[in-house]
């Protein structure tokens, strides 16, 4: 089984001012991780039919009119296809590059360099193709995944949604959790997610990975590439334990090209084992 890496040439061109140039070293950077079990795939365009199962028609029209969202269809499409191929057994796991983010996109709003909610679209597609299932989502971007939280509630998905952000919160059903990175060690928070996920029993795991938490980034909370490697190892082991290794890593926030290159390639190497 191979690791899939989803990418589209448009992601390396300028789109959102913060995200647009960070992938300037790609796709040539993939040459640094030549591996027999690595498969580079071009992210397809997501269908409007699927988008309209998650977002309103007005939302779609507003995204179409926003020139900064030009990469949104391929960004979301890569995540949708990755999840389908991993769950269907064509790939062991996957890493998805994006040109426009997803976790700040709700039912009828978008902000913060996000356009369509890629992970929620992927879950909706899994439900359509394979039936309802339990899904776990961990968000280690510097900012709260408010759009994802709203949508998993509205759409009544069976999702454990765990955000490591700046506040502490646990919903009544125990499935929507925010953990403040000020209140405990970061890796301890990741381990707590693993404990909850083992109890929950997901069939697939999504990791929304933002390198905006890195030292010197706009969401700097003191993390380094070594921390990202440790998190990747923890989540890979969790996936192997609870869902036959089915793990999708979705790139989130971050702006510095050197950090984008080093951190994403490091995480891909962990996925390759």
Tell where the protein language model's regions lie, with residue ranges.
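N-terminal low-complexity, Ser/Thr- and acidic-residue-enriched intrinsically disordered segments
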Residues: 1-52
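A general "terminal functional-core" signal
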Residues: 53-273
């Amino acid at each position: 089984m191979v690791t899939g890496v989803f990418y589209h040439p448009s992601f390396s061109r300028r789109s959102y001012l913060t995200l647009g140039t960070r992938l300037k070293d790609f796709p040539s950077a993939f040459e640094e991780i030549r591996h027999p079990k690595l498969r580079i795939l071009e992210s397809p365009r997501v269908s409007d039919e699927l988008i309209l199962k998650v977002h309103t028609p007005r939302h779609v029209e507003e995204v179409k009119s926003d020139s900064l969202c030009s990469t949104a269809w391929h960004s979301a499409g890569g995540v949708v296809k990755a999840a389908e191929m991993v769950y269907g057994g064509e790939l062991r796991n996957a890493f998805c590059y994006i040109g426009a983010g997803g976790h700040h996109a709700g039912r009828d709003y978008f902000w913060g360099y996000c356009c369509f909610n890629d992970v929620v679209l992927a879950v909706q597609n899994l439900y359509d193709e394979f039936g309802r299932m339990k899904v776990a989502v961990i968000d280690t971007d510097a900012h709260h995944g408010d759009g994802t939280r709203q949508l998993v509630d509205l759409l009544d998905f069976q999702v454990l949604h765990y955000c490591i952000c700046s506040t502490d919160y646990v919903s009544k059903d125990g499935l929507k959790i925010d953990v403040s990175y000020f209140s405990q060690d970061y890796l301890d928070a990741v381990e707590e997610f693993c404990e909850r996920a083992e109890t929950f029993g997901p069939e697939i795991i999504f990791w929304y990975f933002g390198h905006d938490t890195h030292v010197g980034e706009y969401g700097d909370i003191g993390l380094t590439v070594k921390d990202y490697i440790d998190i990747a190892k923890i989540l890979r082991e969790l996936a192997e334990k609870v869902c036959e290794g089915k793990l999708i890593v979705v790139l989130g926030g971050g702006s510095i090209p050197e950090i984008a290159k080093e951190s994403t390639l490091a995480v891909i190497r962990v996925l390759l084992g």
